[in-house]
Amino acid sequence: AIYVSAKLGIADLLMDGPKSCDLLAKSTKTSQRELFRLLRFLASIGIFAELEDAFFELTPLAAYLQSETPSSLRSLVIYYGEETYQPWGSILHSIKTGETAFNHVHKCGVFQYFAQHPESAAVFNQAMTEYAAEETIAVINAYDFSKFDKIVDVGGGQGSFMATILKANDEPKGILFDLPQGVRGAKEYLETAYLMERCEIIEGDFFESIPSGGDAYIFKNIFVNWTDGRCIDILKNCHHAMAENGKLIIIEVIVISPKNAPSFSKLFDLHMLVMTGGRGRTEAEFQALFAATGFNLTNIISTESPVSIIEGVRI
């Protein structure tokens, strides 16, 4: 229900004040009676408010479904309602076979799918920007990036995390590295932030090579998407690109070890099984990846978000 309201843009239509369900139905080309039933339910859980005569208005929760607000989650809701919804319906297939549910449903991997569907890729990129907004602030507050000269954000997408780092630290320069569809829109994003003079955009595949020249290599929510074997391939390429005094920085959810302890990390791990075939990892599992690729895990820093900052250096 939340997805449908986001897809129809109901919150945007209510930006300038309450509107009748009849007008909303005409604007969205939907059935007035069925739209009323949808909005009546959403109003019962605090998303929109039902007024007299079948009028509806925004609530603080509904404001997150607007398109052009700094705290918007609209693209994230649409992403979960479209590309994510069907694969989760096939999680039984994943549990029985070990195959990624997304691949089973869409007949290709998630990143291949987005390469073939640019409109869906645009929604995904914006969704990841929205998802990462709060954790980005938490990471910036927990870690000193000012000590680096050149920071390489590997798989950095549109550049929202890199932009936040550069805005908070005057000295470092950046390299934004991702697949062509990943950095689509990055130039405009960085230009709008007045950061293009400090950040170079490089297209490429981190399974093939990673740009050299950085003294910090950031992987934010990257390894969780991949199997151990593929992670080892990425880390070997990073080891090859990195100077001897460079720093490896992985920003991810760490799966907590205690049995029976409730944790978002365990749900997130299951989500990766469904979507990418990757997995969440414990501290010990990260240490094993580092040891297999010539790195030493030197520090883990908690943040005021689900992610932690995992530091490593070359051995």
Task: Enumerate the predicted regions with their spans.
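Alpha-helical subdomain
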Residues: 1-52, 145-315
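Conserved Class I S-adenosyl-L-methionine-dependent methyltransferase catalytic core
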Residues: 1-150
